[in-house]
Amino acid sequence: MTREEKSYIGFNEVEAKELLLSIGAEAFRYEQIQNWIFDNFVENWEEMENLPKDLIELLSNKIQLHPLQINLVSGSEYEPTQKFLFKTKSGHSIESVLMHEKKRTTVCISSQVGCAVDCKFCATASMGFIKNLNAYEIIDQVLHLERISKHKITNIVFMGMGEPFLNYKNVIKAAKFLNHKMGFGARRITISTAGIVPKIRKIAEEDHQFKLAISLNAVTEIERKKIMSLTNTHSLNELIKSAQYYYHKTRRLITFEYVLLKGINDSPLDAKRLISLLR
C-alpha cells in the first residue's frame, strides 16, 4: 500500500498505536477509536464524541479516516436496491450494492478496479484490469453501507467489480476480518468466482467456512469460451472437477450462478445439459 493510499482504517494495530503515540495520545484512545469505527460506523473524526477536540484536530490534519469516499448513489433509501459509486484514494472508481429483502440485507462488494476475466455479458469487463483493492478498501465498502443502511446488514457477497480469486490474498484477509472482527458469520459471506481452478482447490484445502459461488453461465466448452474467455485457461471440465474436489474436501454445497443470455445459453437442451452437468 503506497503512502497516497494510506488511511487510518488501513493501519494494522501496531501502526495505529504508533501513530497515536507520535501525536501524544493516551494508549486507551486506540480502543475508543476502534469502537467508533467498527461498532458505530462513523464517517469522520469529528463524530468521535469522547475524543478531545485537540486530538480530533491532530488526527484530521494527519490522516484521512476512510480509504473510500462515496461519489454517487443510485436509488433512494426506501427502494430495495441502492448502488454506490466509491472513489479510492488513488482516484479510481468502484461500485457496491445494498439490497434489502424481508428478512435479510445483503451488500455486494468489489474486489478489484476493473477485471481481467473478460466475460462478454459484464460491463466491468470493458474496463480491463486496473488494480487490486487492498483488504481495507474492501472492508471499507461494508463500513460505509453499515452506516447508511436502514437495516442491519446480514449477508456479504463478493460479486461486485473484479474477480475475487485473482485478488485472493486481500479477499481472504478482508473476509476473515469481516468474520472475526465485525461479527459476520462465515456462512453469511459468499465469495464468487468465474472459475479460477487453482484457487478453488486452494480455498478447499485451507478449509475456510465462507460460502463459494461459481459463475458457470454455459454448459458446453464451446459456448463458455464464447462468453467467458477464462475458459481458454481453465476448461469447463477442469472447473467441474475442482468443484467436485471442493465439495468432497469441505462437504459444503456450492452455488452455481447462471446468467440467461437469449439465444446463447437458454434453450431446453441447455437446461437438460445443466442438470446433467451438476447432478
Task: Show which residues each predicted segment covers.
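Conserved AdoMet/S-adenosylmethionine-binding subsite of the radical SAM
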Residues: 146-155, 160-279
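Short, small-residue-rich loop/turn micro-motifs
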Residues: 88, 113-115, 216-218
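Canonical Radical SAM [4Fe-4S] cluster-binding loop centered on the CxxxCxxC motif
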Residues: 100-137
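Flexible, acidic/Gly-rich N-terminal and inter-domain linker regions that tether
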Residues: 1-105
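Conserved alpha-helical substructure of the radical SAM core
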Residues: 125-155
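Short linear Ser/Thr-Pro motifs
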Residues: 76, 110-111, 192, 215
